[in-house]
Swiss-Prot record:
GO terms for cellular component: cytosol. Keywords: Isomerase. Its EC number is 5.3.1.6. GO terms for biological process: D-ribose metabolic process; pentose-phosphate shunt, non-oxidative branch. PANTHER family: RIBOSE-5-PHOSPHATE ISOMERASE (PTHR11934:SF0). It comes from Haloquadratum walsbyi (strain DSM 16790 / HBSQ001). Pathway: Carbohydrate degradation; pentose phosphate pathway; D-ribose 5-phosphate from D-ribulose 5-phosphate (non-oxidative stage): step 1/1. This is Ribose-5-phosphate isomerase A. The active site is at residue 109. It comes from the Archaea. It catalyses: aldehydo-D-ribose 5-phosphate = D-ribulose 5-phosphate.
Amino acid sequence: MKTTGGSEEQKRRAGEKAVEYVNDGDIVGLGTGSTAAAAIDALGDAVAAGYDIHGVPTSFATRDRAIEAGIPLTRIEAVDHIDVAIDGSDEINNNLTLIKGGGAAHAREKVIDATADQFIVVADESKLVETLSEPVPVSTLPMAQKPVKHRLDSLGATTTLRSATMKDGPVITDNGNIVFDCAFGHIENAEALAKSLAEIPGTVAHGLFVNLADVACIGTENGTNVYHGDQDQGQN
């Protein structure tokens, strides 16, 4: 589920820093969420300044935001590669392992983020933690709801079917699936848990992003901290 915290200014700083990794002519994966939206706005400014880029959106909401920002769009089926993906995170540790899916777009996000030559994570400093502990979203085929929940419970999760807020019934993703939010407490071995979740028949995608992110731009009150896969850190 979505976490709260972090100012709009921190998100703006993270988004603007991430756009520095985008070159003229790039195909850019466009993530979902409030900090990814800040990056989309910054990309829109780059387009207005003359950059020739095309975006590949990860959700209907992202598509609409990109159109408003003036970013030309394409579909992943229409390109043979993605140069850079910029996406947010609900929680991130120093190894750049992420929990995503607060916006229920993690299935599409994982495809696009993994396809990109470089995946840049944007977040405010409230999302940076030593140990991941947020509930892990698991998108599931509706017909597999009962057996998937049983398997998730057997892994030690406290499992909640995500409910819609503006209608009765569960949240339905852009791909027509339901979402379980799975609380495991402190996640000491994200790679092993990711493997176990992926092996459950009926799951479509889970929100653990392991060994995918190349760079994280973390907005702070004083600037932006940049983390790389080797855990080097800088501030701008």
